[in-house]
Regions:
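A general structural signal for well-ordered alpha-helical segments in protein cores
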Residues: 62-69, 104, 173, 184
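ATP-binding N-lobe of GHMP and related small-molecule kinases
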Residues: 1-95, 113-119
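Gly/Ser-rich catalytic serine loop of serine hydrolases
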Residues: 90, 94-102, 138
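Generic beta-strand or strand-like secondary-structure segments
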Residues: 64-71, 106-114, 125, 129-132
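Short, charged, solvent-exposed linker or helix-capping segments at domain edges/interfaces
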Residues: 46-49, 97, 184-189
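DPxDG-like acidic metal-binding loop motif
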Residues: 32, 97-120, 143-149
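ATP-dependent small-molecule kinase catalytic core of the GHMP/sugar-kinase superfamily
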Residues: 119-204
Length: 204
């Protein structure tokens, strides 16, 4: 398999997940977008980041977008190349808007665009690779499919599925973005291991 294009660009939305009772399953795409472009090269990989995360995110092979691109190319047996990547980030990092899922989906989608074959790396494969890297599909699915999604993942078989829902017209999300960062792992660690039956029922 070869790469058909040497310059591609994608944009991926922010997402909000863990909606209502849908912990690790329900997510919503938002009208806030990261844009990423890639030139395939024979040289070393370089990453330029503008906006959110500039000066803080990795700028070489350890960059999350690059890692997702590499994994996707490996998965379909496509050749690895050097990349010159430019990221315009508008999604705040570590503030609950799915920045890591958006970066992963951007990387896999860039791989698909470089390959240039509509039959390779379809949306289901993007969902699978993204969920594998992210650990759960709740932010990945709305970043891939748009709208609202209900998703699930079998941890034993790694099978991933998602159903897309169209939100009612006239509903506009409002995001309250804190002025501090909180990593997902730390936020999850603050949650109790179990929830009382009454609380779970009330949340539904």
């Amino acid at each position: 398999m070869r790469l058909r294009d040497d310059f591609v660009a994608v944009k991926v939305p922010a997402t909000s997940a863990n909606l209502g009772p849908g912990f690790d399953s329900m997510g919503l795409a938002l009208d806030l977008w990261d844009e990423v472009s890639v030139h395939a090269t024979t040289g070393a990989t370089s990453v330029v980041v503008e906006g959110e995360g500039a000066g803080n995110v990795e700028q070489g092979e350890d960059n999350l977008v690059v890692r997702a691109l590499r994994l996707a190319l490996d998965r379909v047996g496509a050749p690895q190349v050097g990349v010159r990547m430019h990221c315009t980030n508008r999604i705040p990092h570590s503030r609950g808007l799915g920045s890591s899922a958006s970066a992963i989906v951007a990387g896999v989608t860039l791989a698909r665009a470089l390959i240039g074959d509509a039959d390779v790396l379809g949306r289901q494969e993007i969902l699978e690779i993204g969920s594998q890297m992210e650990g759960h599909p709740d932010n990945v699915a709305p970043a891939v499919f748009g709208g609202a999604t209900v998703s699930w993942m079998n941890e034993e078989s790694s099978e991933v599925g998602s159903v897309r829902l169209t939100p009612p017209e006239g509903i506009s999300p409002v995001a309250f973005i804190p002025d501090f960062e909180l990593r997902t792992a730390a936020a999850r660690a603050a949650l109790p291991a179990t929830v009382p039956h009454g609380d779970a029922s009330f949340n539904v």
